[in-house]
């Protein structure tokens, strides 16, 4: 059925004879469809511009336009995902060689791009820590704040993020990579050799905050270490109580003079440095005691451990007694015995660098409640709130990392169909904007026709999903200052509280109770049921940098595509009779039988697990002969969109109001939805040309004719099938004639009036397809070869897409084109049509490795019939 039959019959300005002529033979109808007058008459019905007195429609039942924003919905019961301990094997290249032989040049190139991934932008803009967690949910700002902070700590627990300890030190959990060994300071509580060799000074501050002393020649020295629980967020574990020993060490101060000091060193595996039996007390008494002693010594809220002179201050700072007593108060809890190095006894404590930090949460112990909704009631309800911060297994040196962030974070639904789980969104858009934006490398995108040529086979299909695929790729430690995220802590909810309060100023004490409010009090009570004592840790500010590849950077999709394509190449070389390809985090396998596919799947899961690659077993899909990939259903007959996309298009089209001006934002969104299914319609993308013209900041009025025509067009979908070269012909054109040449005949029709040469060439190709039935056409017009007919008149472009659907084109130079003379009205002697090299679109996609033929020569010592068949290499159909 002609696609315009219903449309032409509903146009009142067209007579019956004119309609029959337009729907008649193609040699008569196609030149008329290219006429400017007819296209203007049809466009006048479908492109009515809105008058000035009509208001634009900004929202339909399913599509929102200008001035209608969709408010984000926060789910208080969002589930935090559990990330596996992702760590790619250090000897990945060696394991590759063991499993599938030597790596190819392309595989080496792709893997070297990812081990480690490097990211060094031209310029980096740093933002204050107060913008670390975006307030995208004003009604649930407190709940979203703690949920986002918990998500970041979960990523740190999984070894995906670094934790900034100071501007030159980072800590993380997991195993270090070889390229970071030179930056190691501490690994599993032991000082690393590279760090000891690089420091020639007599004393240094370790990553845990203790004082490390140079080994004396008289005897070995044991460094003070601490062990945190393996899972801080899980059940509290009882730490072994081991006594400490007091040893005297020769210490050289910073000025070079020797001196003696006493250091309390606990045994390995102990989390208590001082004697827990003699000094144990509950958290409340310890906090009050320290606070009262401070007030006796110092009249102001802030204090230092030094005397007034600078030399005395340096000596006290590096003295083990003064620093150690303040830094590690010992206390005990009935369930857990947290690490003393991370706990501050009073409202002020020493951090990892030896400077004083302010704990807002513990400050409420030492103040009187300001009312019924004071946070003092919550803080005083629990004896032990745990440490203010925690440290990882490994500590490394890093480039200067400021106390700033480079991108904010917020939580959203995992995907539109799963609102029970959350996903972290990181905004690193600064690297894609402005004159300093980073130009990301381009990579090939799968073409629809190429997918049909490669995958439209009768194979058994299986799709695998790499769990947290981006977080498999490590990032160079030097790139950490450019990929910083963080949380401002509880002080964010008090605008009047300054982060830069100097010593001797008690403004924090005065403004501390500005936090207290009924809303915050009730929210923290509810959050305490969820987070428990971890609420104290989340209330502290922190800064983290990405150790693995983040999803918010434009470089990430390119690197992930290189990584997964290398995995697919390994699978293809290890299983020659298997089809394997990858797109982003999806790995697709194909085999001739289900049993063969099951065996391949079992082996791949084992190999990937040995390499440190985690597969999401829950998302493994066995598709049979109907592969679902990228929203398409791929079968042996071709490719069609999934039913959910077809229903979505139908719903959106039916919700469009008629004879009302729609704003251009609605037109843009509707065009994007229709574009996804357009290749499967008769007229293709050309049917949406009127909508494309309306997206240029103008409104669009849907007439009943155009609306009903689109509904009928999208109600009948045709699959995109494989390109097969069977019958071929060659076409050429002049402004007044066409020429068609096949192996058996020459055709030379003429036109009634002159046409542009580009229009005549596409009409000649349509006539050759209609008269000869050839699916392989040769032409010398580059526009026809591209298949993009949207630059032609609208009616001609729609009909040409319908006629040339499923046709392949080959370039034939004009000098060698046998249809050149027939197009000029000359009929020479019939010559054989030149052989057209049919090259279907493959988009440089590799699906399989050629299976080498088996040698027909057998060893003489083999006395039985070999089960190996002598055959040619197998290629998938």
Curated annotation (Swiss-Prot):
Biased composition (Low complexity): 267-281
Gene for this chain: P
More about this protein: Hepadnaviral virions contain probably just one P protein molecule per particle.
PROSITE patterns cross-referenced by the UniProt entry: RT_POL
Record region (Spacer): 184-382
Keyword annotations: DNA replication, DNA-binding, DNA-directed DNA polymerase, Endonuclease, Host-virus interaction, Hydrolase, Inhibition of host innate immune response by virus, Inhibition of host RLR pathway by virus, Magnesium, Metal-binding, Multifunctional enzyme, Nuclease, Nucleotidyltransferase, RNA-directed DNA polymerase, Transferase, Viral immunoevasion
GO biological process per UniProt: DNA replication; symbiont-mediated suppression of host innate immune response
UniProt domain Reverse transcriptase: residue ranges: 393-634
Region (Polymerase/reverse transcriptase domain (RT)): 383-723
The protein's role, per its UniProt record: Multifunctional enzyme that converts the viral RNA genome into dsDNA in viral cytoplasmic capsids. This enzyme displays a DNA polymerase activity that can copy either DNA or RNA templates, and a ribonuclease H (RNase H) activity that cleaves the RNA strand of RNA-DNA heteroduplexes in a partially processive 3'- to 5'-endonucleasic mode. Neo-synthesized pregenomic RNA (pgRNA) are encapsidated together with the P protein, and reverse-transcribed inside the nucleocapsid.
Family membership noted in the UniProt record: Belongs to the hepadnaviridae P protein family.
Pfam families in the cross-refs: DNA_pol_viral_C (PF00336), DNA_pol_viral_N (PF00242), RVT_1 (PF00078)
Ranges annotated as spanning the membrane: none
Chain residue ranges for the region called Terminal protein domain (TP): 1-183
Record: residues binding Mg(2+): 465, 585-586
Protein name: Protein P
């Amino acid at each position: 059925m002609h696609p315009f039959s219903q449309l032409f019959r509903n146009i009142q300005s067209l007579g019956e004879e004119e309609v029959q002529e337009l729907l008649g033979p193609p040699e008569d109808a196609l030149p008329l469809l290219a006429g400017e007058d007819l296209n203007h008459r049809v466009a006048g019905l479908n492109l009515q511009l809105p008058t000035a007195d009509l208001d634009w429609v900004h929202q339909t039942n399913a599509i929102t336009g200008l001035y209608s924003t969709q408010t984000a919905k926060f789910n208080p019961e969002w589930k935090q995902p559990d990330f596996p301990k992702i760590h790619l094997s250090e000897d990945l290249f060696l394991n590759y060689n063991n499993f599938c032989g030597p790596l190819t040049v392309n595989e080496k190139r792709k893997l070297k791009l990812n081990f480690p991934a490097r990211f060094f932008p031209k310029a980096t803009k740093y933002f204050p820590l107060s913008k670390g967690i975006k307030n995208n949910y004003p009604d649930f700002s407190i709940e979203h704040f703690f949920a986002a902070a918990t998500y970041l700590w979960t990523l740190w627990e999984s070894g995906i993020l670094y934790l900034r300890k100071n501007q030159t030190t980072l800590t993380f959990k997991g195993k270090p990579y070889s390229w970071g060994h030179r930056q190691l300071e501490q690994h599993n509580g032991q000082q690393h050799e590279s760090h000891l060799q690089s420091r020639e000074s007599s004393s240094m501050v370790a990553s845990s905050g203790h004082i490390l002393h140079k080994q004396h020649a008289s005897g070995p020295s044991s460094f003070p270490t601490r062990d945190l629980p393996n899972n801080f967020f899980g059940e509290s574990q009882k730490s072994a109580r081991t006594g400490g020993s007091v040893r005297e060490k020769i210490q050289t101060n910073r000025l070079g003079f020797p001196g003696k000091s006493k250091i309390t060193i606990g045994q390995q595996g102990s989390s208590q440095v001082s004697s827990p039996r003699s000094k144990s007390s509950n958290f409340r008494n310890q906090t009050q005691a320290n606070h009262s002693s401070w007030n006796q010594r110092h009249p102001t809220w802030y204090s230092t451990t030094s005397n007034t002179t600078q030399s005395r201050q340096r000596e006290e700072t590096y003295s083990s007694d003064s620093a150690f007593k303040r830094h590690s108060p010992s206390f005990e809890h009935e369930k857990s015995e947290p690490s003393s190095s991370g706990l501050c006894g009073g409202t002020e404590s020493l951090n990892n660098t030896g400077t004083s930090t302010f704990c807002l949460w513990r400050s409420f112990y030492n103040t009187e409640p300001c009312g019924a909704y004071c946070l003092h009631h919550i803080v005083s309800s629990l004896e032990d709130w745990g440490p203010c911060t925690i440290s990882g297994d490994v500590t490394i040196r890093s480039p200067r990392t400021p106390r700033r962030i480079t991108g904010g974070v917020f939580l959203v639904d995992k995907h539109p169909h799963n609102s029970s789980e959350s996903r972290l969104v990181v905004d690193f858009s600064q690297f894609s904007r402005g004159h300093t934006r980073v130009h990301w490398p381009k990579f090939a995108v799968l073409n629809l026709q190429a997918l049909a040529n490669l995958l439209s086979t009768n194979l058994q299909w299986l799709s695998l999903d790499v769990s947290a695929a981006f977080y498999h790729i490590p990032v160079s430690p030097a790139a950490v200052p450019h990929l910083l995220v963080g949380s401002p802590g509880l002080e964010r909810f008090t605008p009047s509280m300054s982060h830069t309060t100097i010593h001797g100023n008690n403004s924090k004490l005065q403004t501390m109770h500005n936090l207290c409010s009924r809303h915050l009090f009730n929210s923290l009570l509810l959050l305490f049921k969820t987070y428990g004592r971890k609420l104290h840790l989340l209330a502290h500010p922190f800064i983290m940098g990405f150790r693995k590849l983040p999803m918010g950077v434009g470089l990430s999709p390119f690197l992930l595509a290189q990584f997964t394509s290398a995995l697919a190449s390994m699978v293809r070389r290890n299983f020659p009779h298997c089809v394997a390809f990858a797109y982003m985090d999806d790995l697709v396998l194909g085999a001739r039988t289900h049993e063969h596919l099951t065996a391949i799947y079992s082996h791949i899961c084992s190999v990937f697990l040995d390499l440190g690659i985690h597969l999401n077993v829950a998302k493994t899909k066995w598709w049979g002969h109907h592969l679902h990939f990228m929203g398409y259903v791929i079968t042996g007959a071709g490719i069609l969109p999934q039913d959910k996309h077809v229903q979505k298009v139908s719903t959106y089209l039916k919700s469009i109001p008629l004879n009302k001006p729609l704003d251009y934002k609605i037109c843009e969104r509707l065009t994007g939805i229709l574009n996804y299914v357009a290749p499967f319609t008769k007229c293709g993308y050309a049917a949406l040309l009127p909508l494309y013209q309306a997206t240029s900041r103008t409104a669009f009025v849907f007439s009943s004719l155009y609306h009903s025509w689109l509904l009928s067009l999208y109600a009948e979908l045709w699959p995109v099938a494989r390109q097969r070269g069977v019958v071929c012909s060659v076409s050429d054109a002049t402004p007044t004639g066409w020429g068609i040449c096949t192996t058996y005949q020459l055709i030379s029709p003429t036109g009634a009036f002159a046409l542009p040469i580009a229009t005549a060439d596409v009409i000649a190709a349509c006539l050759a397809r209609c008269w000869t039935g050839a699916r392989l056409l040769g032409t010398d017009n580059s526009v026809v070869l591209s298949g993009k007919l949207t630059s032609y008149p609208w009616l001609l472009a729609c009909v040409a897409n319908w006629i040339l659907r499923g046709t392949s084109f080959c370039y034939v130079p004009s000098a060698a084109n046998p249809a050149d003379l027939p197009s000029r009205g000359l009929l020479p002697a019939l010559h054989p049509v030149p052989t057209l090299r049919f090259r279907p679109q493959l988009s440089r996609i590799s699906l399989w490795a050629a299976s080498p033929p088996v040698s027909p020569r057998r060893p003489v010592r083999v006395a039985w019939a070999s089960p190996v068949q002598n055959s040619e290499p197998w290629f998938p159909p």
